[in-house]
Every structure is written in C-alpha cells, then in structure tokens.
Amino acid sequence: MEKKKMSLPVQIVLALILGIVVGLIFYFIGKPEITTNYFKPFGTIFVNLLKFIVVPVVLLSMIDGIISMGDMKKVGSVGWKTVAYFLVTTAAACVIGLVFANLFNNAGWFPTLALEDGAVWDKATSANFMDTLVAIFPSNMWKSFTDANMLQVIVIALMFGGGILAAGEKGKLAKDLVSTLYAVIERVMAFIIALSPIGVFTMMAWVVATQGPEILGSLAVVLGCAYLGYIVHAVLCYSFSAKAFAGISPFTFFEKASPAMIFAFTSTSSAATIPLSKECADELGAESDVSSFVIPLGATINMDGTAIYQCVATIFLATCCGMTLTLGQMVTIVVTATLASIGTAGTPGAGMIMLAMVLEAMNIPVDMIMIIYGIDRLFDMGRTCLNITGDISCACCVTEWESKKAAQTAK
C-alpha cells in the first residue's frame, strides 16, 4: 500500500509550529545567535527566490489572462468591477478596524506605551497619491522589472496584452510564446513553493529566538484586536459576498481557499501566493481568464488587511499619546486609509507607509510607529492572508457578474 504524501499546507503548518518551538529553545538557552548565523540564511534564500519569481509571475499571468479573454471590452469590464470590489471592501475593512479598536480601547484593554529613546521613523519613505499616479507609468521597462515595481509591471502587462489582442492573427506567435513561458514559470513557481516549509521553519525559528516570548508581551492585545478584525472581515465581507454573488457557501469557500491562505500567512507575500490563489479561485468556480487577471491585480492593489491594521494601530498609538479621536477624525481615517491603499499599492513596505500617512493626517507623531514596528511581521502574516482571501472572493464574484452580463447580452 502506497504511503500518502503529506499535503503542502500541512507541511507548512508543522514547519511553523516546529520553528516556534525551536526558536523558544534557542531563546531560553541564551543562544539566539545560532539561528541568526545558521537558520536565517536559509530563510533569506527562500525569500530571495520568492522575490525573483514575482515579476515574471505577475507579468505573464496578467498577459495570459488578457489574451484568454479575447476582447478588450471584457478586460475593461472585469477591471472596473475588480477595482470597485476592492474599494468597497477596503472601506468596510476600515470601519471594522475602527469598531474593534474603539471597543478594545474603551474597555481599557489597550496598553499605554512610550516610544523608546532614539527610535525614529524615516518619513522620507512616505509617498503621496499624485506621485504614485505619475510613477505607475514606466519610462524604462527593464527598470520596472529590476526594481520589481508591481504597478508598472501591471501597466506593462495591460499594454502588451492589449497590443497582442489588437494585432489579431499577426499576434498568434506572441500568444503562443506567452502561454509557453507562463507554463514554464508555473513549474518554476511550484518548485519554489515546495521549499516553503524550509523557509517558514528557519524564519520563524530566527524571529522567535531573537525576540522571545515578549515579541507579543504588552502588544498582544493590539495584535489580538487586529486579528479579530481580520477574521470578522473575512467572514462578513468575503465569504458572505461569495455566497451572495457566486452562490458559494462560507464553509466551502474557506475550505477550498485554505491552501492559499495558509501559504500567504506563512510567506507574508501576496505576489508569491498568486499561483495558489488562482488555483483555489478556479476550484471555487472562477473562470480561468478572469482569475488570471483579478488575482495578480488584487495581489498588488487589494490591501484590506493593511486597512484594518492601520485603523487599529492609529487608535492604539493615539492612546499612547494620550489623544482621544473624534468621530470626524475617524471618518477621516476611513477616507485617508482607503485612498492611501491606492496611493501606496505595490510599494515595498506599503503597510508602514499607509500608517504614516494616516498618522500625519491625525497629527499623531509619525515616530510612534516604532512602538509596533518590532512585531510588524506578526501583523503582516494575518493581513497578507486576509488580502489574498479577498482576491479569491473577488475572482469568484466577478466571474458570476460577467456570466450574468453575458447571459443578458445573449437574450
């Protein structure tokens, strides 16, 4: 009898648990430098491989999706529906984040912490919306690739995909080339993803060994508040919208989306999760051409998890400063956070940049970010998981909307 192979999601979860245990052991024996010298390098190799494959995956999957649609009108239709879905859910995420943050704060559960001496946030990393709008149009295609500027990569994919469709029969060779290259990239990505248990184990062991149990400490309540927001948003917005618009039960939705959710949680990379997210979306009934377009786009612009995080963090940091925010200021947070999610889309460290924008809008010292900066990876695991869950839900909903539109047109 052939022994059944352990599934990748199970391997990743076991690697996560084992990494925490090993990390705690090295922390308590006072040898965290062992994980820094001998564990972290392997985790870094895994992260480098993820970064290496992100650009070709996004570029080729989007071009392939556009070509598969066969009509630029459908591309436009799918595009605006996708962006609208993400804007609505991002606004909802902000409201959920604020509700839970205020509940926790009014209950006196948020600790009042002080900024450590010498801790300074580099404001130079902030960017405004208009700067980003100009920057999404590339002046040098190769620089966009080498800098991994994902918004520029998406624009390049839209232009080449549209150009191939417009070329008609003359573009057949280009279509075949894209399909072939995408098939190869999928195989390479599968190989890299297969290494994820090693990457997860080594990185978690290093983080826990160097930070210790106090990586949570007094910030555990803030972390718990954010994760409660993540869970409620996933259930209320994503699973319910999948049920209402695509006829998928919440249980089925989470069951079939779980492989991508687990991988995103441990890798903290939406872009690296694209192949798994697409596979999960297709299994839930999304059309392949729609998911090929929606998933890469969502991996770049869907930042619902980040929106919840920054609302919780803003209320918490305001409390640390002794400030009490008014209802009007909270409405400003919702608007600022929603617009910031567009303005910083595809920017490395976007979560922190968005938070800096919101804090500046609230006149809260931006340097206060440094209070929670140390455990940002723990916040990031949850928000990345939530973001890709939204991508999958969106692909299913847009597929259903396009199907209904096609049915009405056919009448």
Where are the regions that the model predicts?
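Helix-loop-helix junctions within the multi-pass membrane cores of secondary transporters/permeases
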Residues: 259-341, 395, 405-411
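Membrane-water interface of transmembrane alpha-helices in multipass transporters/channels
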Residues: 31-38, 76, 213-221, 247-258, ...
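Signature of multi-pass transmembrane helix bundles
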Residues: 2-3, 9-13, 20-32, 47-50, ...
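Residue-level signature of catalytic and energy-coupling elements of molecular machines
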Residues: 7, 46, 75, 145, ...
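Transmembrane helix boundary and interhelical junction motifs in multipass membrane proteins
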Residues: 54-58, 196-199, 269-277, 307-312, ...
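Transmembrane helix-bundle signature of multi-pass membrane transporters/permeases
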Residues: 45, 63, 82-87, 159, ...
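Transmembrane alpha-helical segments and their short flanking loops
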Residues: 311-411
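Juxtamembrane helix-boundary/capping and inter-helix hinge elements in multi-pass membrane proteins
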Residues: 67-74, 109, 167-172, 180, ...
